[in-house]
Amino acid sequence: MLKGNLAGLMKQAQQMQENMKKMQEQLALIEVEGQSGAGLVKVTMTCRNEVRRVSIDPSLLADDKDMLEDLVAAAFNDAVRKAEATSQEKMSGMTSGLPLPPGFKLPF
């Protein structure tokens, strides 16, 4: 009986690994957009944290350089938070039956 349980666990782990790989591939295709300055600065990135685009409204180019840098950083951080939230949401279905501690993040 122990042998059967072990084989079942191994099969379940292998299936989860395959599902995890598929989910990571899907996350690489999902894009989120972070914004700052009421949308004057936008950063588009995938849920794998690959930046695709940075958009800066032309009206900001003549303004203070420090302010523009702060807005770019804020938009980037907003995009990272959205990517993390989306990733956690998508992964939660895969880990719902596992006894993982609260706040445990996947993929590793």
Swiss-Prot record:
Residue ranges of the TM segments: none
Composition-biased stretches (Polar residues): 85-95
Pfam families documented for this protein: YbaB_DNA_bd
Keyword terms of this UniProt record: Cytoplasm, DNA-binding
Gene3D superfamilies referenced in this protein's UniProt entry, alphabetically: Nucleoid-associated protein YbaB-like domain (3.30.1310.10)
Single GO term (MF): DNA binding
Domain of life: Bacteria
Compartments, record wording: Cytoplasm, Nucleoid
Region (Disordered): 85-108
Cellular component annotations (GO), alphabetically ordered: bacterial nucleoid; cytosol
Biased composition (Pro residues): 99-108
Keyword Transport included in the entry's annotation: no
Quaternary structure note: Homodimer.
NCBIfam families cross-referenced by the UniProt entry: DNA_YbaB_EbfC (TIGR00103)
Functional description taken from the UniProt entry: Binds to DNA and alters its conformation. May be involved in regulation of gene expression, nucleoid organization and DNA protection.
Similarity-based family: Belongs to the YbaB/EbfC family.
Protein name: Nucleoid-associated protein Bcen2424_1826
Native source species: Burkholderia cenocepacia (strain HI2424)
